[in-house]
């Protein structure tokens, strides 16, 4: 047992110094549990409350699309230059070295392909496996206005409930329903529904008109998808406008790994997201880095 005679009474209690409570300032996440906040603080840089994610989960329904034929050759060299990796568990286990030491957002929905109805997805990963992989969030598509809208919302609810049990954030990714136009009204509806169901992060698309209303009406952080490949200057302009209008980051794939200089593009995107560089200066950085 302890030698009680050798235990010295504490003296420096700082009685005149009130204890400070640290605030978790990420939008809408201040009341979450410690484990949930810890994972979110790995995804979002605590200094900026923003993030740059590299998405290479496309193969779960597209197969080996252009740029993703060989993850080890095309994507692995980009890992050091991004904040977060977004991929499936199959790619994570087979292609991402455990020593990479980057937070992972795990694609947790699937069971569909480009040959069938995309909205017909299921939860494709058990929460226990996500915990085993030590990821920082799970992600699933939500298809508002689609044939399988109800099913996709239930997928989000299932992940949120399981995530709350274990301290695992859920990112809802807004797919586009066939019967709705890709505009501010649609994405305001889709992002708000996903947030109301409890998702802690929303991934959606940038729109030229009214994006600030989408971001303002969503009570949790929004990150924008890169979408189809754009010329680098246009992609950087989209990033800048989204951040300027309230997005908390980007989750880009094709506009990174299909770029003529992927590392340079990632550095330029980082400058926009974390350093508030405008698109012109970021493009100049891209040009200088690609040489």
Swiss-Prot record:
InterPro entries hit by this protein: Aldolase_TIM (IPR013785), DeoC/FbaB/LacD_aldolase (IPR002915), DeoC/FbaB_aldolase (IPR050456), FbaB-like (IPR041720), LsrF (IPR033673)
Active site positions, chain numbering: 203
Broad class of the protein's primary localization: cytoplasm
UniProt xrefs under SMART domains: DeoC
Keywords recorded for this protein, A-Z: Cytoplasm, Schiff base, Transferase
GO cellular component: cytoplasm
GO MF annotations, alphabetized: acyltransferase activity, transferring groups other than amino-acyl groups; fructose-bisphosphate aldolase activity
EC number: 2.3.1.245
Pfam families: DeoC (PF01791)
Claim: Transferase is one of the keywords in the record: yes
Annotated CDD domains: DhnA
Protein's cellular compartments: Cytoplasm
Domain of life: Bacteria
SUPFAM superfamilies: Aldolase (SSF51569)
Catalyzed chemical reaction(s): dihydroxyacetone phosphate + acetyl-CoA = 3-hydroxy-2,4-dioxopentyl phosphate + CoA
Similarity field: Belongs to the DeoC/FbaB aldolase family.
Role of this protein: Involved in the degradation of phospho-AI-2, thereby terminating induction of the lsr operon and closing the AI-2 signaling cycle. Catalyzes the transfer of an acetyl moiety from 3-hydroxy-5-phosphonooxypentane-2,4-dione to CoA to form glycerone phosphate and acetyl-CoA.
Subunit structure: Homodecamer.
Record's protein name: 3-hydroxy-5-phosphonooxypentane-2,4-dione thiolase
Organism: Photorhabdus laumondii subsp. laumondii (strain DSM 15139 / CIP 105565 / TT01) (Photorhabdus luminescens subsp. laumondii)
């Amino acid at each position: 047992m302890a030698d009680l005679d050798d235990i010295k009474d504490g003296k420096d209690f700082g009685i005149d110094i009130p204890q400070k409570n640290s605030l978790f300032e990420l939008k809408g996440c201040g009341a979450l549990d410690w484990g949930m906040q810890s994972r979110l603080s790995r995804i979002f840089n605590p200094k900026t409350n923003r993030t740059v994610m590299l998405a290479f989960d496309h193969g779960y329904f597209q197969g080996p699309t252009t740029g993703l034929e060989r993850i080890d050759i095309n994507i692995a060299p980009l890992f050091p230059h991004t904040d977060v990796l977004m991929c499936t568990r199959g790619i994570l286990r087979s292609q991402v070295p455990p020593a990479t030491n980057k937070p992972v957002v795990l694609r947790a929905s699937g069971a569909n392909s480009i040959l069938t109805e995309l909205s017909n997805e299921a939860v494709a990963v058990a929460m226990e496996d996500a915990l085993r992989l030590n990821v920082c969030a799970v992600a699933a598509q939500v298809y508002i206005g689609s044939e399988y809208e109800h099913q996709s919302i239930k997928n989000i609810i299932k992940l949120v409930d399981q995530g709350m049990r274990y301290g695992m954030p859920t990112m809802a990714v807004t797919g586009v329903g066939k019967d709705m136009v890709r505009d501010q009204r649609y994405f305001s509806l889709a992002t708000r529904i996903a947030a109301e169901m409890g998702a802690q992060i929303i991934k959606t698309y940038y729109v030229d008109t009214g994006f600030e209303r989408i971001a303002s009406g969503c009570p949790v952080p929004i990150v924008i998808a890169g979408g189809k490949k754009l010329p680098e200057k246009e992609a950087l302009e989209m990033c800048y406008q989204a951040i300027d209008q309230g997005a908390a980051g980007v989750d880009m794939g094709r506009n990174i790994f299909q770029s003529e200089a992927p590392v340079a593009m990632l550095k330029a995107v980082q400058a926009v997201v974390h350093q508030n560089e405008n698109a012109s200066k970021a493009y100049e950085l891209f040009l200088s880095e690609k040489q």
